[in-house]
Regions:
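A sequence-level detector for short glycine-anchored, His/Arg-bearing signature motifs
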Residues: 29, 46-47, 120
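A basic/glycine-biased coupling hinge at the interface between accessory DNA-binding modules
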Residues: 2-19, 37-38, 59-264
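Short hydrophobic/charged patches on amphipathic alpha-helices used for structural packing
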Residues: 30, 264-265
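Short helix-coil-helix linker/hinge
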Residues: 23-28
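Walker A/P-loop
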Residues: 38-57
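A cross-family signal for key residues in well-ordered alpha-helices
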Residues: 33-34
Length: 265
């Protein structure tokens, strides 16, 4: 669709208002915050404000959505709306803030549609605390601010039945895993010096880290006897876990990816 003069004027003023909202950031931080189209990678050292950028980016997504990068005016926008925004840009009165944000928003996300993933529990707690201060407790509680494994567990507890598991699944620890593995090795009458339980478990763990299923692993074996047996063990191991309605730690992410790939909804 061809841009009109009204579109260009509206988009320019809207962008300026949104930039004004994040004027406390430096230029590079603000650029990252306002980038909403496609993936974004931020490389920065410790203490450079990465978490601040993440928090402010979430605020932008919640309040303005794609507004900063949208080139078109809303379909129902009027010249009066444009004049209002221009007046607000020049004199941002607090009592006009709500309407200005509404006129600048393009498909803003709802809090429960935002997911912010961290590596550690400490980082997740800090992120949640800062979100409470930034957007309020109610919205912060609705945002998915968790570690990878916590977020994946929440997804699995809700929808793992689509993979043939019950929602009451258990998570096997290292001792549970080893017990299952030893039983499998003995059932196959394999030399435990050649097929050490710990080494086999580590191999399977690496496969899961790389999102390689038992079937995919078996397809890569070719004429390698050792790998062929690992593929067989891997298949039996996953079958044993499923029969027990259990996952191991690596399955938490592996099964979540499988669930999302197989179910777009």
């Amino acid at each position: 669709m061809e841009l009109t003069k009204f579109d260009i004027q509206y988009a320019s003023i809207r962008r300026a208002i949104i930039e004004q909202r994040f004027a406390h950031l430096n230029e590079m931080q603000r650029e990252a915050v306002l980038q909403t189209e496609g993936p974004l990678l931020i490389l920065a050292g410790a203490g450079s404000g990465k978490t601040t950028v993440l928090i402010q980016r979430i605020i932008n997504i919640l309040r303005f959505g794609r507004g900063a990068q949208c080139e078109y005016a809303p379909a129902n926008a009027t010249p009066d709306d444009l004049r209002f925004l221009l007046d607000y840009l020049n004199d941002p009165k607090p009592e006009c803030e709500h309407r200005a944000e509404w006129l600048c928003a393009v498909e803003p996300a709802r809090p429960w549609e935002v997911i912010a993933i961290t590596f550690t529990n400490k980082a997740a707690r800090e992120l949640k605390e800062r979100l409470v201060r930034a957007v309020g407790e109610q919205d912060a509680d609705a945002i998915w601010a968790y570690t990878f494994h916590t977020a994946c567990l929440r997804i699995l507890r809700r929808d793992i039945e689509r993979l043939g598991y019950d929602k009451s699944f258990t998570i096997y620890d290292e001792d549970d895993k080893k017990r299952v593995m030893v039983d499998i090795l003995r059932s196959l009458k394999l030399d435990e010096k050649v097929f050490d339980a710990r080494a086999v478990m580590n191999t399977i763990s690496r496969a899961k880290d790389n999102l390689i299923s038992p079937k995919a692993y078996a397809a890569e074996v070719k004429d390698d006897y050792y790998k062929g047996k690992i593929a067989e063990i891997y298949t039996l191991y996953q079958k044993a876990l499923k029969n027990a309605n259990a996952l191991d730690f690596d399955d938490i992410i592996f099964k979540t990816v499988q669930l999302l790939r197989q179910n777009e909804d």
